[in-house]
Amino acid sequence: MRANSCIIAAFCAIILMAAACSAAAEKAAQDDPLLFKQDAWPLLQVHCVRCHGAKKQKMGVDFSTMTGLLSILGHRDVWRRAREALESGDMPPDPEETSFTDADRKRLMDWVRDRVETIDRRSPIYLDPGPPVLRQLTRVEYNNTIVDLLRLDRFDAASAGGIVDPSNFVSEHFANLAAAQSLDQTLVEKYLAAGDAALDVLFNRNAKARSALLSAHPDNQTSPHDAARVVLTRFLRRAHRQQVDGDELDELLGIFDDATRAGDGFEPAIRKAMRPVLVSAAFLYRIEEDRPDAGSDAYKVNDDELAVRLSYFLWSSMPDDELFALADAGRLSQPDVLDAQIKRILADPRARALTDNFAASWLRLAMMNRALPSQDVFPALTRSLKDAMRQEPALFFDNLRAEDRSILDLLDADYTFANEELARFYGIPGVSGPKMQKVALSPQFHRGGLLGMGCILAMTSHTDRTKPTARGKWILDVLLGTPPPPPPANAGNFAAPNNHAAPPKNFREKLALHASDASCAACHKRIDPLGFALENYDGAGAWRDSDAGKPVDNVGRLPRGKEFQGVEGLKQVLHERQEQFIRNVVTQMMTYALGRQLQYTDDLAVADIVDALKRDDYRFSTLIRGVVMSRPFLYRRNG
């Protein structure tokens, strides 16, 4: 009966939501300042429908079905992608062929921006904080939580129980996304082994941690049962990260009492009571309870849930005592208190987790572990140099947090981090010792920002040469958030056509020949120019002015015909697409914080954070505060 009621309630909620959206769209249609049929549809018919219409739907887009505001409302994600393609010049792919002028581009972009913003702010659907997700602790979060819960110095679930993350950091997903996670019987057994190992360290090898955790002991005034109640109440509060359930506490006390009746002492009995907690759903998952009285309406998460969201976002671990105390007092959600906690948590060394878990995944830094360049071809690329290269982007990103710098430093900066070996590889004098340190840069070194870092350049190279396509794709994927579609099945085939008069003279000509294939041309026009701009860096990331005795060809040409040269020209191109980069950083950070892919209902939150960054010099703390203060972070709805 309850299941049927839930289905009926959900169906009614969908109908009500659709009706509300319909009404909003109809109202928007009445006072639409840029009429769709006059300003947008004629341009789409002439320049877009040929590839994105009823007969052909490239990228799965069919504009022929979107002939009014109601249909537009249901395809907001498509319009967002269209706006980005127009802004970047990626679409139309051949503007000259279709007579698509700059005025046409501006008119269509103006219409898309106005419609997206107008519809977004009027539609009640944008009050939706997004679907609730059930998030399992990642291996890193599990390790950190065990350490903080049991007051240990360190713990490694991989060695203790064989636990690894359910998703791969090298993939396009963060390991903490709910959709990438699962829990089966084998993993439960591994968690049980890891929990036993952690309790073994606590009770047998760490007297200081044990003393802190066992806050009560039996004596003449306190019975073993009463002392256990004190210890287990606090332990359960911190382990489950929510208010203590009396029935669960009684179950643990029952385990304790059974153990003492069987002859166990106080500490062995406490250990037996703690054991099931470490494999409980409330420990392994971040559980947020639905509120039946809320119906389909969004509601603020409670202070316990907010503390958990905040600490796992910024520390990849459980709340500390201060967060628990504020949550218990019902004060954490007060704006001034929450703002102060954001500053405190960001300043804590544990916030390095943002670098280790967010930045490492977003930037695909794990690719460096299997970077292809060979030391036989590039003798300077020693193991120690590779290690320094790995550290550079991580230290750089963490410095943005520690010094609250502009996130635009990721595109270009007058400093980096290097030790003596890496500085020598870069041609930077005056750096000594094996320790990584902050180093000032000048233009003559051709570094600054992510694009000048050896790690990024080496991990996007072949064994014996550069790989412009991989470098260009990394820029589109990671920096701009506009990944090209997967290549066709024969994309790796570089064989020249039979009618080609002469073989290509160099790799650039070979790639150009390959890109001339109709199935490859559109993507390579976007990808290759960006990669060729980095040709002054060899396969290992060292600067060079010539290749095989000839000057390096580092000229790129964008789809709209604009030429640029070298890494400095590329940085200028990225500067012109700065808002797209900022929006992508915000999108990536929100995805990581929420544990789910964003949807079009999150667009307003993203736009508000982008606007806040513009007003505050793009400071790192403004990005984090914007995410935490956003509606999707502070609110939830029933599943």
Pin down the residues of each PLM region.
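Aromatic- and Gly/Pro-enriched helix-to-coil junctions and flexible linker segments
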Residues: 21-214, 237-238, 242-245, 249-254, ...
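Sequence context surrounding c-type heme c attachment/ligation sites in exported
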Residues: 21-81, 88, 95-102, 239, ...
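Extended surface/linker regions that mediate inter-domain or inter-protein docking
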Residues: 111, 133-136, 141, 147-151, ...
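Active-site-adjacent structural elements in folded domains
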Residues: 215-222, 238-239, 260, 291-297, ...
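Positively charged n-region of N-terminal signal peptides that target proteins for export
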Residues: 1-5
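Alpha-helical scaffolds flanking conserved acidic
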Residues: 226-227, 231, 266-274, 300-306, ...
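Secondary-structure transition/capping motifs at alpha-helix termini
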Residues: 262-265, 317-318, 330-333, 428-433, ...
